[in-house]
Amino acid sequence: MKNINNTQFRELVNKNSEAVIIDCRTESEWDEGRIKNAILLDLFESQLFMQKVEEFDKNKMYLVYCRSGSRSVAACQILESVGIKNVFNLTEGFTGWDGDILV
C-alpha cells in the first residue's frame, strides 16, 4: 500500500482508466457525495467486503478512500492480504478531497 495525497490520487485516476476506485465509507456517507467512478464497498459490512475483494482482479490498480483516511488503510491492508499489490490510499480521505464530487 502506498499513501498518496489528493494531487497524486487525481493523477492516478486521470492516467489509469482501468483503475478501480473504492469508497469504503457507509452508504449514508456515500449519499453525501463521492469521487467520480467510485464503487461503494462499505468496510463495516465485513463479510460482503471480503467476498467482493476476493473476486477482484489482482492485476488491476486500486485507489481507496474513506472519510478521513483511517478506514481506507484497513481496506488497503485487506486488499493486500488477498494478493493485490497495486493499492493506493488517499491519506486525507474524502473530507480532504479537492477534486470533482458527485452527489
Q: PLM features: what roles do these ranges have?
A:
Residues 1-19, 27-61, 70-103:
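Rhodanese-like catalytic fold shared by cysteine-dependent sulfurtransferases
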Residues 65:
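Short, surface-exposed ligand- or partner-binding patches at beta-edge/loop junctions that are enriched
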